[in-house]
Every structure is written in C-alpha cells, then in structure tokens.
Amino acid sequence: MTKGTQAFGKKHVKSHTLCKRCGKSSFHIQKKRCASCGYQDAKKRTYNWGAKSIRRRTTGTGRTRHLRDVNARFRNGFRGTTPKPRAQPTN
C-alpha cells in the first residue's frame, strides 16, 4: 500500500452534501457543519478577507421581497392596510 498520490484516487465517499441554509454542497456530513455558511451555528460564517463572498451574499442581492415592502410602507408613512376614514361633511 502506498500513502501518496495513488491512494487519493481511491477516495469515492462523499464528505459534503447540500446545506439547508445556503444550498451549497458544503455541509460536512460527519462534522455536521457547513464549510460555506457555518450552518448549525447561530450566526452566518463571514470573514472580511472574503470581501467578494460577502458582496455576493449580502442583503439586496436576492429578491428582497420584505425590504421592498418595508420601503413602500416607509414612503407612505407606515399607514395601516385600511384607508383612513373620510371626513363626513358637516351640515
């Protein structure tokens, strides 16, 4: 048996699978931790040396459905869903 380059060709077992949080195939099956987002930890894994990675994943890069709704409500002064009752004309 050799311990060098030839032995690495025999590796065929998957060590990583899909992550529930980020969807990448970076969730380590034995460690139960995602190498990309750090899933199982409460906070998302980010490092400042990965500035490009932060730029790709940050708020505003996806649908931002909730934030668009918040912005629309902000422009209208956070009014409720029901319109204000019209003032009755006084006679």
UniProtKB/Swiss-Prot annotation:
A zinc finger (C4-type) spans 19-37. The keyword Ribosomal protein applies. Keywords: Metal-binding, Ribonucleoprotein, Ribosomal protein, RNA-binding, rRNA-binding, Zinc, Zinc-finger. GO terms for cellular component: cytosolic large ribosomal subunit. Its cofactor is Zn(2+). One of its GO terms (molecular function) is zinc ion binding. Zn(2+) binds at residues 19, 22, 34, 37. Binds 1 zinc ion per subunit. One of its GO terms (biological process) is translation. Binds to the 23S rRNA. Belongs to the eukaryotic ribosomal protein eL37 family. This is Large ribosomal subunit protein eL37. It comes from Caenorhabditis elegans. The gene is rpl-37.2.
